[in-house]
Amino acid sequence: MFSKAFLSAALLGAAAVEGHMMMAQPVPYGKDTLNNSPLAADGSDFPCKLRSNTYQVTEENTAAIGQSMPLSFIGSAVHGGGSCQVSLTTDREPTKDSKWIVIKSIEGGCPANVDGNLSGGPTSTGASKFTYTIPEGIEPGKYTLAWTWFNRIGNREMYMNCAPLTVTGSSSKRDEVPKEKTVEKRSANFPPMFVANVNGCTTKEGVDIRFPNPGSIVEYAGDKSNLAAEGSQACTGTPTFGGDGNTAGSSGSSGSSSGSSSGGSSSSAAGSGATAPPAPAVSSTLVPKPSQSSAPGVFVPTGSPAQPTHTSAPSGGSSSGSGSSSGSNSGSSSGSSSSSSSSSSSGALTGSCSSEGTWNCIGGSSFQRCANGQWTAVQQMATGTECTAGQASNLKIKATNLKPRMLHEMRHRKRNYHNHA
């Protein structure tokens, strides 16, 4: 009798000649020249499967903030599913240096929850259909959307299709596609996109990976038994590029932070012990600024620190953990950092803080924030900007004088941006 693994491998081999998968909706850039193969293993066509006329706009996709939009695929070689992300950049012709922010992660069952491949060949539309939503905190403007996929079975690959997207302001109730079935909402934040299998960091075969920084919206569409163990590494090796999204936040992924549960990550039938993977450490809202005043791909911090909200957990077996949550937050606002905070020689603060929402600008070139009772990791200011040093309730940002070479590069990028917008 053949094993399940053998049958899965046989199905994958039989479908190898049928190609792989492509994004159908939103309509990708250069649809006529896009093929269904993964990115090159050496990363030479990252991002967006670089080729001739990569960023030709076949059809401009439009989405309003808060509107649920379809995410669908064409093809049958789903390689046992896997995990996917939906990300945005303000660059309309992204490069390896572009900054991507994650607006949704799908851990397991993407693009389909099967053991091998689907039938139907490269024109099949039988893969699962998902949705994504442009969240609050994203400004109206022109973006590039990326769908990335890390397959569970087969060669270690990364798939990436990109699409032009115009984001409009939110509106009243409208016709929307159905909402996600099992979605985990976390503190509002937009972490960097995960990159692997093209940069020296390799994912493990046979599991649906958990993303180190999955972001605010996480959907679980696969079998719990296929999901990687909580706290496990998503990939091994040192990434040569795109490694910003490959490291978990300082809160870690062990589930030991306040408000997490020890034990399993599924909810019990009785409703107690429901737990969720931990939220990333940096919880201040990051807002993309696609305006002409800043270079494409720059994201400027703004808004108030968001509080984590757990609305659901992966479906499956009962949880072995207690599911207890301290639920406590520091409510005091003294205007200065807590005495338990420690300061480094660079001016960065670590540890707990009581001045919730306070910004700490370090030498004008980097910043951090008191969020959820802890100082966040230090982040660098965007090129061409600086902040006013010290602690304050608002982060004061101003433009700086740029070197002629930097100004030339920014103007060149802006010209390209508007020519293709």
Curated annotation (Swiss-Prot):
EC number from the UniProt entry: 1.14.99.-
Keywords carried by this UniProt record: Carbohydrate metabolism, Chitin degradation, Disulfide bond, Glycoprotein, Metal-binding, Monooxygenase, Oxidoreductase, Polysaccharide degradation, Signal, Zinc
Cofactor: Cu(2+)
Residues that hold Cu(+) according to the record: 20, 79, 93
Polar residues: bias regions: 304-314
Any GO molecular function: monooxygenase activity
Chain intervals with Low complexity compositional bias: 247-285, 315-349
Record's protein name: AA11 family lytic polysaccharide monooxygenase
UniProt entry tagged with the keyword Transport: no
Gene3D superfamilies listed in its UniProt record: 2.70.50.70
Cofactor comment text: Binds 1 copper ion per subunit.
Keyword Glycoprotein: yes
Disulfide bonds: 48-162, 84-110, 201-235
Protein task: Lytic polysaccharide monooxygenase (LPMO) that depolymerizes chitin via the oxidation of scissile beta-(1-4)-glycosidic bonds, yielding C1 or C4 oxidation products. Catalysis by LPMOs requires the reduction of the active-site copper from Cu(II) to Cu(I) by a reducing agent and H(2)O(2) or O(2) as a cosubstrate. Active on chitin but has no activity on other substrates, including diverse mannans, cellulose and starch (data not shown). Primary chain cleavage yields predominantly aldonic acid oligosaccharides with even-numbered degrees of polymerization.
Family, per entry: Belongs to the polysaccharide monooxygenase AA11 family.
A Gene Ontology BP annotation from the UniProt entry: polysaccharide catabolic process
Gene name linked to the record: AA11
Signal peptide, first to last residue: 1-19
Annotated stretches, region: Disordered: 231-349
Residues bearing carbohydrate: 117
